[in-house]
UniProtKB/Swiss-Prot annotation:
One Pfam short name: Toprim_4
Gene symbol of the encoding locus: recR
Zinc finger intervals, C4-type: 56-71
The protein, known as: Recombination protein RecR
Function of the protein: May play a role in DNA repair. It seems to be involved in an RecBC-independent recombinational process of DNA repair. It may act with RecF and RecO.
CDD domains, alphabetized: TOPRIM_recR (cd01025)
Family per record: Belongs to the RecR family.
Domain of life: Bacteria
GO biological process terms, semicolon-separated: DNA recombination; DNA repair
Domain Toprim: 79-174
Keyword hit for Transcription: no
Keyword Zinc-finger annotated: yes
Record key words, sorted: DNA damage, DNA recombination, DNA repair, Metal-binding, Zinc, Zinc-finger
């Protein structure tokens, strides 16, 4: 149906999250209609991002610098941390412009069915960081799901011995069970942050 190079482009685009066959086809046809200079710029941007963007050694955010801009910022409140499952959730929290503390990205949620446990996430790094830096409050901005609940409680259990007085809270209302944090609008997230509850 398609010439081999076009079929290969469609196949590669389909590997991206949220891209089905029809969307991949539309994107591929759009891309081959663009001037060569635009395609070269896109390819160069992809390669540059892949070669230069790494995890921050402190919070595990994606960054071209280490530590990341958030961890380096003197305007951030080092006593207040937000624990998120993924960088997409960090970005969602930043869009609210309400959270002024630091972050810790776990790298996912505990999911025994998918073979994801404590050792596959940045939980031990969080425990060591809390013991070392002694924040006053940890806000869990974790999507309300079974995996999210399990992850929050496991992290809490790991932290209790090293930080027995650490206040641990979670986002409040506005996030229905099973929803993804990254898709919540800024107002809902800001209100959930403001009305956070003890964990």
């Amino acid at each position: 149906m398609y010439t081999r190079p076009l079929a290969r482009l469609i196949e590669e685009l389909q590997r991206l999250p949220g891209i089905g066959s029809k969307t991949a086809q539309r994107l591929a046809l759009h891309l081959i209609n663009r001037p060569a200079g635009e395609i070269e710029a896109l390819a160069k941007a992809l390669l540059e991002a892949k070669q230069t963007v790494r995890h921050c050694s402190i919070c595990f955010n994606w960054s071209a610098e280490d530590p990341c801009e958030i961890c380096r910022s003197p305007q951030r409140d080092p006593s207040l941390w937000c624990v998120v499952a993924d960088v997409k959730d960090l970005i969602a929290m930043e869009r609210t412009r309400e959270f002024k503390g630091l972050y810790h990205v776990l790298g996912g949620l505990i999911s025994p069915m998918n073979g994801i446990g404590v050792d596959q996430l940045h939980i031990r790094e969080l425990v060591a960081r809390v013991a070392r830096e002694k924040p006053q409050e940890l806000i869990f901005a974790i999507s309300p799901s079974v995996e999210g609940e399990v992850t929050m409680h496991v992290v809490k259990d790991y932290l209790k011995p090293v930080a027995p007085t650490l206040r641990m809270t979670r986002l409040a209302f506005g996030l229905p069970m099973g929803s993804e944090l990254e898709y919540a609008d800024e107002v809902t997230l800001a209100r959930a942050l403001e009305a956070r509850q003890e964990l």
